[in-house]
Every structure is written in structure tokens, then in C-alpha cells.
Amino acid sequence: MNKLAILAIIAMVLFSANAFRFQSRLRSNVEAKTGDACEQAAIQCVESACESLCTEGEDRTGCYMYIYSNCPPYV
């Protein structure tokens, strides 16, 4: 292979690696901004949303625990 072909292959590999890293970072930023509805309800201290948005069991219990430990008038 000539030098130009080798350089082109190296450039393609580096470009695809950077594109993959950018896509992963973008995906994690979007997930961090949206979060799940149960978590958002807890952060916003909406007890009724814990009942309507969270599934039975651990999710709902965690939502209530967050509210009771961090949100007025419980604090």
C-alpha cells in the first residue's frame, strides 16, 4: 500500500472513534437532562406524582423517602 492509502485508513479510524465518543457523550447528556418521571417527581417534591408516575414497590418508596428527607414541610 502506498503512504496515502495508509494515512487515509488511519484518518478514517480516528474520525470514527471521535464520532463514537461524541455520540456517547451526547446520549448521556440527553439521559441526564430528561431522567425518568419518578426521579423528576421526587426532585420536584410532588408526592401525588410519586403515586401516579412511579411503579409499585421500590420506585415509589424511593420517591417518598427523597421527599420526606429533602422537601418542605418534612425537612
From Swiss-Prot:
Origin superkingdom: Eukaryota
Classification via SUPFAM superfamilies: Protozoan pheromone proteins
GO molecular function, one term: pheromone activity
One Gene Ontology cellular component annotation held by this UniProt entry: plasma membrane
Region forming the signal peptide: 1-19
Keywords associated with the record: Cell membrane, Disulfide bond, Membrane, Pheromone, Secreted, Signal
Propeptide: 20-35
Intrachain S-S bonds: 38-54, 45-71, 50-63
Gene3D superfamilies found in the cross-reference section: Pheromone ER-1 (1.20.50.10)
Cited InterPro entries: Pheromone_Er1_protoz, Pheromone_protoz, Pheromone_protoz_sf
Function: Mating ciliate pheromones (or gamones) are diffusible extracellular communication signals that distinguish different intraspecific classes of cells commonly referred to as 'mating types'. They prepare the latter for conjugation by changing their cell surface properties. The membrane-bound form promotes inter-cellular communication and adhesion for mating pair formation and may act as binding site for the secreted form.
Subunit structure: Homodimer.
Protein name: Mating pheromone Er-1/Er-3
